Amino acid sequence: MLQVSVYRYNPDQDAAPFMQEFQVDTGGKDIMVLDVLALIKEQDEGFSYRRSCREGVCGSDGMNINGKNGLACITPLSAVVKGNKLVVRPLPGLPVIRDLVVDMSIFYKQYEKVQPFLQNDTPAPAIERKQSPEEREKLDGLYECILCACCSTSCPSFWWNPDKFLGPAALLQAYRFLADSRDNKTEERLAALDDPFSVFRCRSIMNCVSVCPKGLNPTKAIGHIRQMLLQSGT
């Protein structure tokens, strides 16, 4: 039997959060953490968590698993369990709605600030705006983000200033459009990032890199933005 400790909090009935212990029979199999949560829900139907695709694509089930953020659906027990103990908590730094469900509003608000869509005020071509293979290659490692928030909620700078520091996920997407040859709003995008908090509160500790389920490198992208800001003189 696997010993599982999960964070519980129902604001309608709990005065404060608490950790609840469960014994889960995994059948001796190396199942995913999400499967363990489903077995817990069979024991307690009121247990709440987010999940959707079960394939590491939607980003819904980001949570803190034995002290490290990750996606429950693609995290096998063998990768995290030590001493037959599993501890699951909500993503840190965000308000808890119930149990493992967090309020993502500030995360999406910061993402929205970078205007994550192509902007080009030149006349649109009849078919599409073309890119060379080399130009397209510059977007690799940027567009694959699934907005699971594992990176931003592992970042102390985001914990301390969630309303000012944009966070790794938003800044990765900021650079994704700065690097896109089809976008011609570089000057405006950089001007919007020109303040002491939006970009420069990153301390390059690379927590974001260590937890990204897609193997992306927000710290590197933030470094590129810093360089562009310095070179532009803004």
Q: Which residues does each predicted region cover?
A:
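Short N-terminal binding/cap micro-motifs at the start of the first secondary-structure element
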Residues: 11-16
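Short, contiguous acidic and Ser/Thr-rich linear segments
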Residues: 20-31
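Short strand-turn-strand beta-turns centered on an Asx-Gly dipeptide
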Residues: 25, 64-68
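Active-site phosphate-binding and catalytic loops of NTP-dependent enzymes
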Residues: 44-50
